[in-house]
């Protein structure tokens, strides 16, 4: 097995400065979060400023409400993403070390947890302001793919969340002892750049599909449809990529080398697949409901 693509020599930090003895660094991952949120916010604002895209030419939210909701979304992403990682992937460790649960600067965020955080934030906000929830879910879903695209690219730059070992010509030799520890492989180990697979499927393709549905097919006139396509599209994309993505180390044992979170007689699902199945089912239900209501 050989790597045909060497990992690019890039630092996770864009730059670092020292202020009063404290080192402050801007990392690609943080920049991806910031730019992704801003791009999603601008995309949503464009949609709410187009009354013709909405049922009865009435956007469900004003531009001011979108900006207000953005604060709730940011809090939901950070808290949900962190708590999702803690309880979905390493509950035992963090229950023994509760002081590290909120140490987000040490790394460890989960998309499914962040999604639950955003859903909770959106539910509370729409309840307080008496906003139609399905239409609000549509507009929130529209703003997610830019963050997914940039976030997964940042994962690649950070050389984290890499894929399983492969002999395909686009395999990448990620740095680090863990990335190069491949069972049965001598010499350099090439891995699937699964972060880029996710960036393309969940970010670029899914984002383009949602934009096409909103601006070309007036999908916002059918509440719940855009959100349904997002849930189903992300769920299917993530479920597929999990076949190529290296599972978290805590799930891998001698009797479970594939790192399956649930398995019977060698067959099973990774944690990412287990969490994606409910998304697929919810997405299908929302799409069917929206079509029936139309």
Swiss-Prot record:
Subcellular location per the Swiss-Prot or TrEMBL entry: Cell inner membrane
Chain segments annotated as transmembrane: 19-39, 69-89, 101-121, 139-159, 195-215, 224-244, 267-287
Xref: Pfam families: LGT
Membrane topology: Multi-pass membrane protein
Xref: PROSITE patterns: LGT
Positions annotated to bind a 1,2-diacyl-sn-glycero-3-phospho-(1'-sn-glycerol): 152
Signal peptide start and end residues: none
Gene Ontology molecular function terms on file: phosphatidylglycerol-prolipoprotein diacylglyceryl transferase activity
A GO cellular component annotation in the UniProt record: plasma membrane
SS bond list: none
Involved pathway(s): Protein modification; lipoprotein biosynthesis (diacylglyceryl transfer)
Gene Ontology biological process terms in this record: lipoprotein biosynthetic process
Keyword Transmembrane helix: yes
EC number: 2.5.1.145
Keywords noted in UniProt: Cell inner membrane, Cell membrane, Membrane, Transferase, Transmembrane, Transmembrane helix
Family, per entry: Belongs to the Lgt family.
Function: Catalyzes the transfer of the diacylglyceryl group from phosphatidylglycerol to the sulfhydryl group of the N-terminal cysteine of a prolipoprotein, the first step in the formation of mature lipoproteins.
HAMAP family found in the cross-reference section: Lgt (MF_01147)
Annotated protein name in UniProt: Phosphatidylglycerol--prolipoprotein diacylglyceryl transferase
The encoding gene: lgt
